[in-house]
Amino acid sequence: AERGLLPPGELYRVAHGLAEALDAIHGAGVIHRDVKPANVLLVDGEPVLIDFGIAHVADDVRLTMAGVVMGTPGYLAPEVISGQDVTPATDWWGWAATTAFAAGGVPPFGRGAMSAVLARVAQGEPDLRAVDPRIEPLLYAALAPDPAQRPHHHEVVAALESYAHGAPATAAIEVRR
């Protein structure tokens, strides 16, 4: 999935497959924490989520060093950057950032100095201009800085179904602006 700029049918297949994978791991009580293009392999056109190296079980107590953040800056959810608890919403944020890259071919929070990228993430300022306008509202909603504002699995899947049928992916989500 690192190549980006997938055509709509392939984008739907990858985004939907990744959404189903996240639903399965969340159902098992696991949070991946590092959903990004480099951790999604395409096998016969189907996404496979890899690298559970920093994943954790949702009920586990975290043993981390204060101030240490692990991950790729443009794909770290705001709550990871600020040291807050991670939840399934953290992975939905990573899903949206990864899907935005696949849809537009560019990282949604840009490139450049780590501090600048992290600031754009924390402020919820993705650049989705290269993304198909039919899926942009879903990605924008899932990239909300506040985890409580992000859509859940069933909302994501319903919005993706709208997108797959040529309609805007807004039917099942509230669009924040």
Residues covered by each model-derived region:
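Eukaryotic protein kinase
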Residues: 1-175
